[in-house]
């Protein structure tokens, strides 16, 4: 029987082996961490939205006393006035009280919807400025929105009762569309159609309720009939489509919002997202909606910004705008849609 002789490692060799073991372990840990971070959504408390804390004293950010005044400063008072003039060039002269009331209604409904929408989306910015709830807090912002809408409903009912039915019905439709969008976000795709044509139709119906009803409301208030419904619906669809496309195709818009592909990261459907679900690699879009990890979002954006999906969106924009150029000139939103798949 032979005896195996082992030579103890020198102190230097032991130190080198320990260092090598630590290095390999550290590298393995880095790889595991990278894979985990890349494949799983960040905890909500780690996200920028939860690190951003609004000013304790809103006066240090703005001299305005409430969220509604703040967002109204961003968009301007009576920002629907050009549309009112186009619908009824003589209304301001013929019935100045109604003219002013229509503009107050449109400001209140439109801007208050934005206040609540920014809370729902967790948006940090609105047109390059801090979102109202980042300054005043979500509770005060939401309550002020409800308060202002209630004021408008009361003023319309008492001062312009013939306009109240139009306002109530269209506001109900707007909120139905918004509710449908939020339910899709909550439940994921299990209650969303699977056929491509049905998906596009379902999304357009939601947009017609949420955005279309806002534009149709303007025609109803000014003209007190439905004669402009088709035109207003088309203008609204273009507006929704343009906003959807800016969210994923515009560097300018991303800078103003402080986020890239905010809809996708929030699990919210948009027209490019709906189209991309049926494109090659569309499974990444569905994965990103379910779990917006960096890896899933990155691959989903590659599908959304693919030439095929981008071209379909641009074609829909061109088709929907062809007969309403005079109205779009009043809308005046022209961010460049310059982001495509690399």
Swiss-Prot record:
The lineage of its organism: Eukaryota, Fungi, Dikarya, Ascomycota, Pezizomycotina. CDD domains: Trans_IPPS. Dimethylallyl diphosphate binds at residues 126, 210. It comes from Penicillium crustosum. It is found in: Membrane. This is Prenyl transferase penC. One of its GO terms (molecular function) is prenyltransferase activity. InterPro entries: Isoprenoid_synthase_dom_sf, Polyprenyl_synt. Belongs to the FPP/GGPP synthase family. Gene3D superfamilies: Farnesyl Diphosphate Synthase. Prenyl transferase; part of the gene cluster that mediates the biosynthesis of the indole diterpenes penitrems. The geranylgeranyl diphosphate (GGPP) synthase penG catalyzes the first step in penitrem biosynthesis via conversion of farnesyl pyrophosphate and isopentyl pyrophosphate into geranylgeranyl pyrophosphate (GGPP). Condensation of indole-3-glycerol phosphate with GGPP by the prenyl transferase penC then forms 3-geranylgeranylindole (3-GGI). The keyword Transmembrane applies. Mg(2+) 2 binds at residues 117, 121. Mg(2+) 1 binds at residues 117, 121. Isopentenyl diphosphate binds at residue 110. It is a single-pass membrane protein. It is an enzyme of class 2 (transferase). Keywords: Glycoprotein, Magnesium, Membrane, Metal-binding, Transferase, Transmembrane, Transmembrane helix.
């Amino acid at each position: 029987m032979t005896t195996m002789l082992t030579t103890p490692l020198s102190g230097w060799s032991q130190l080198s082996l320990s260092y090598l073991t630590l290095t390999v372990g550290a590298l393995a840990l880095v790889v595991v961490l990278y894979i985990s971070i890349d494949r799983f959504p960040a905890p909500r408390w780690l996200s920028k939205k939860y690190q951003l804390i609004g000013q304790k004293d809103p006066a240090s950010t703005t001299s305005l006393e409430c969220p509604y005044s703040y967002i109204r400063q961003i968009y301007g008072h009576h920002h629907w006035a050009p549309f009112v003039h186009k619908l009824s060039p003589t209304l301001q002269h013929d019935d100045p009280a109604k003219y002013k009331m229509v503009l107050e209604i449109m400001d209140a409904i439109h801007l208050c919807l934005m206040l609540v929408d920014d809370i729902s989306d967790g948006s940090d910015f609105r047109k390059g400025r801090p979102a109202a709830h980042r300054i005043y807090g979500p509770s005060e912002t939401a309550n002020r929105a409800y308060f202002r809408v209630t004021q408008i409903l009361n003023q319309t009912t008492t001062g312009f009762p013939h306009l109240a039915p139009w306002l109530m019905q269209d506001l109900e439709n707007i909120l139905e569309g918004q509710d449908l969008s939020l339910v899709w976000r909550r439940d994921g795709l299990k209650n969303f159609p699977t056929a491509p044509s049905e998906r596009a139709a379902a999304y357009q119906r939601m947009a017609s309720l949420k955005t279309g009803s806002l534009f149709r409301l303007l025609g109803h208030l000014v003209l007190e009939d439905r004669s402009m419904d088709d035109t207003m619906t088309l203008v609204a669809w273009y507006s929704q489509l343009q906003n959807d496309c800016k969210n994923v195709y515009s560097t300018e818009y991303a800078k103003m919002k402080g986020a890239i592909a905010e809809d996708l990261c929030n699990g919210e459907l948009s027209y490019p997202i709906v189209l991309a679900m049926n494109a090659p690699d569309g499974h990444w879009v569905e994965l990103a909606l379910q779990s917006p990890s960096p890896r899933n979002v990155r691959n989903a954006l590659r599908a959304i910004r693919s030439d095929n999906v981008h071209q379909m969106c641009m074609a829909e924009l061109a088709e929907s705008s062809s007969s309403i150029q005079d109205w779009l000139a009043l809308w005046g939103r022209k961010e460049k849609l310059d982001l495509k798949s690399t």
